[in-house]
Amino acid sequence: MTAKYYAPTGGLPGQDQLLTDRAVFTDAYAVIPKGTMRDIVTSYLPHWDDTRLWVIARPMSGFSETFSQYIMDVAPNGGSNKPETDDGAEGVLFIVEGTATLRVNDQTHVMTEGGYAFLPPKSGWTLRNETDAMLRFHWIRKTYEPVEGIPYPEVIVTNENDIAPTMMPDTDGKWGTTRFVEPTDLRHDMHVTIVTFEPGGV
């Protein structure tokens, strides 16, 4: 199965368009319709060139108390040589459109759609869009919570297409969960997973 990911492109609604999309925030979750991610609600971060973003979650925004999540929109030749300004923050990148060049630990990784990277604190990573097309990805950030006697986790760079999803029991193969980190690996204090529902799944 080839995954398809949604990536916002911005723009403005037509003046004759009926606007019925509504975002819903609760203490447990948020539903953000794609039509709400327009040019007028983009933000910018320091040290990022030719890049804008949509803030999906930030600490104390209802359902989010410990993490932030952005959808990054990087133009050709854009990116950052100093993307993370918090030495205590860990991050996950997930590519939904385009190609990213990630440099970390003296290695260069070319990440395409479905690409996943876990970046522990103080990784010193950089990310550039070295193509002629737009790059869009999710960036999830969280302050790492160390535990005495447990080492910090290592960098992970992989792709969703290289990991077989775990099918949930009694779902006839219609509900799968792709895990990038084993739940028993207690070096990790957060997990980003992909849940897939096939038609007919509940």
Regions found by a protein language model. Give the residues of each.
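Glycine- and acidic-residue-biased ligand/ion/polar-headgroup-sensing regions
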Residues: 76, 88-101, 105
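Conserved short histidine dyad/triad with adjacent acidic residue
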Residues: 50-59, 68-87, 180, 193-202
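Well-ordered beta-strand positions in beta-sheet-rich domains
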Residues: 71, 108-110, 124, 194
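Short acidic-glycine-tyrosine-enriched beta hairpin
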Residues: 92, 105-121
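Asparagine-centered strand-capping/turn motif at beta-strand->loop junctions
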Residues: 127-131
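A short, N-terminal "cap"/entry segment at the start of jelly-roll beta-barrel domains
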Residues: 2-66, 132, 136-191
